[in-house]
C-alpha cells in the first residue's frame, strides 16, 4: 500500500500495527521459552532470554521479574557448583563458612527442582566430610625435623600418626648437613589409608 500511496497514513498505520504484532508475538514466544528454561533450571539461558526481551521492551514487568529471579538462582547455583568442584577447599574456615551460608540460602528456595535438590544433598555431604578426621601415618628416619605447614611441628620420629581433616597439606623436613625436603599431599575421604614418608637423605 505504501508503494502505491507513500503518504497514506492508513497504509503506514497498518504497517506499524503489523510490525507491532510481530514484535509482540516474538516476545510472547521468548517469554514462554524463558519460563520453560526456568522449569528446567537452565538459569543462564533463562536470564539471557529475559535480557533479550528487555532489550526489545524494558518496561515488561514479567521480563523484569523473570530476569531478577533467574539471575539470583544463576548466581546461587554457580556458587554451589564452585564449592562442589573443589571440596578440599572446605578445609579453609572461610570457605567452609561461606559454603554453610550457601546451604542456608539454598534451603530457602521455594519449589526447588531436582537439580537444586541434588545440589543441596551434595553440599550437605561435602560439609559433613570436610569435618571428618582421617588417620594419616608419617614415617621418617628419627633424624629429620618434620613440620606440617599451617598445622604443627612434628619433630623427629620413626613413625607418628595424626588425625587430619580432608584438605591439601605440605610437609617439610630439615636435617643438618642434608638437603631439605618438601612433600605435598592431599587427604580425602575417598582415598586412604594415608602413609607419608619424609626424610632428608641427600647430603649437601
Regions found by a protein language model. Give the residues of each.
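Short loop/turn and low-complexity linker motifs enriched in small/turn-promoting residues
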Residues: 4-5, 13, 17, 39-55, ...
Amino acid at each position: 500500500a505504501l508503494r502505491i500511496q507513500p503518504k497514506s497514513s492508513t497504509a503506514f498505520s497498518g504497517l506499524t500495527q503489523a510490525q507491532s504484532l510481530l514484535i509482540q508475538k516474538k516476545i510472547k514466544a521468548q517469554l514462554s521459552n524463558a519460563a520453560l528454561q526456568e522449569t528446567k533450571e537452565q538459569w543462564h539461558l533463562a536470564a539471557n532470554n529475559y535480557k533479550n526481551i528487555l532489550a526489545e521492551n524494558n518496561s515488561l514487568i514479567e521480563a523484569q521479574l523473570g530476569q531478577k529471579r533467574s539471575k539470583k538462582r544463576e548466581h546461587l547455583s554457580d556458587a554451589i557448583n564452585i564449592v562442589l568442584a573443589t571440596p578440599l577447599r572446605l578445609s579453609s574456615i572461610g570457605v567452609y563458612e561461606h559454603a554453610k551460608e550457601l546451604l542456608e540460602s539454598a534451603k530457602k528456595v521455594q519449589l526447588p527442582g531436582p537439580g537444586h535438590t541434588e545440589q543441596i544433598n551434595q553440599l550437605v555431604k561435602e560439609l559433613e566430610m570436610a569435618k571428618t578426621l582421617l588417620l594419616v601415618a608419617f614415617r621418617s628416619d628419627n633424624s629429620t625435623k618434620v613440620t606440617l605447614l599451617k598445622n604443627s611441628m612434628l619433630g623427629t620420629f620413626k613413625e607418628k600418626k595424626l588425625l587430619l581433616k580432608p584438605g591439601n597439606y605440605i610437609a617439610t623436613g630439615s636435617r643438618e648437613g642434608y638437603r631439605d625436603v618438601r612433600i605435598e599431599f592431599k587427604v580425602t575421604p575417598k582415598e586412604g589409608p594415608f602413609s607419608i614418608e619424609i626424610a632428608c637423605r641427600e647430603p649437601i
